[in-house]
Amino acid sequence: MDTAEAAGDPGPWRQQAILGRRDWDADALRDIVRDYVIEHLADDDAVLVIDETGFLKQGKASCGVARQYTGSAGKITNCQIGVFAAYVSCHGHAFIDRTLYLPKEWTDDPDRLEAVYVPADVGFATKPKLATRMIARAIVASVPFKWVAGDTVYGVGDIEQQLRRAGKGYVLGVNSAHVFRSWGKRQPVSGTAADIARTRRSSDWKRLSAGAGTKGPRLHDWCYLELADLEAEQSNSANNGLWTRGLLIRRRIADGDFAFFTTWCPAGTSIETLVAVEGHRWAIEDSFETAKNEFGLDHNESRSWHGWHRHVSLAMLAFAMMAAIRHRANPPPPKKTNRCPSAKTRTQPRRH
């Protein structure tokens, strides 16, 4: 059932008018949603998760539509791609930002952009670039979070330097050919992520859960290699103290398949903490599924740039309200320690 039918309308025209032809600011609504989420779910140890999802389409008229890969279909298909930021804390999770990705075949065609009312100041931007803008907006808005997590799409570009300067930790996916080198460590490490993983000893691995899944704990084997300790000031960071750059490797128990993550965290951070941060990425996948199934995230009835952002922002608002209600109905049990131990740093004596 599409959103017009669910609303009892005989056709999509009313919703198309509201989303595509009325004059209202979708970015203002986005900011309202963000502030609402923080009001109800804020925690200093929260994780900002960056990911994308596909909106399957027919035809070529909808803004940003192209034949491109989407995990929603698991293949290259005709679709739009939206990049999202989700706020994940021990109180719940919800979206706080979004933007529509425009492929170069769109940004290189001014007539096509004009036909769907793309603003004149919007040009081509890679998905990692869109992510840096979302992170910047969250920082400017004083959103409380300690970590950023993302898959291999977002483990490249300027995100690492941006987060280091902001004093934020991260666990970001990288591909198997990504090169890592250690310095100042007793055990030198050098090579591609895949080569490093293949030379690890059995004692280097630790079986840990990345969180609860639908079938129980999401268990994998993990290996964490500290590559270098750096003073925060070396990255022009707002923070002080020693921070560690590292490589986190995940090995699937069933078939030994590897996944790799570049990490940045306060010195002494445990592997359990980094695994927990990486495991928070599951929350945005759950959010996409729920938002599409329950709130019509992918049932947009308009074709314009403004229509997409308005529709998606409204779906985000509905999801945020559900997350707040769920949190109030299911408060976490009181803890003797800090509120979110899964994403805390274990303090250890300085080794240098």
Question: Language-model segments: which ranges?
Answer:
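An anionic, glycine-rich sequence signature occurring as long contiguous blocks
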Residues: 74, 91-116, 120, 169-283
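Structural motif
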Residues: 72-78, 253, 303-312
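Basic, amphipathic alpha-helical segments enriched in Lys/Arg and hydrophobic/aromatic residues
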Residues: 297-352
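Short coil/turn segments at secondary-structure boundaries
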Residues: 1-5, 288-294
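Short amphipathic alpha-helical segments and their helix-coil junctions
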Residues: 58-69, 290-302
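Feature representing long, continuous alpha-helical segments
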Residues: 282-289, 315, 319
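Conserved, well-structured functional cores that handle cations and Mg-NTP chemistry
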Residues: 1-172, 176-179, 186-187, 196, ...
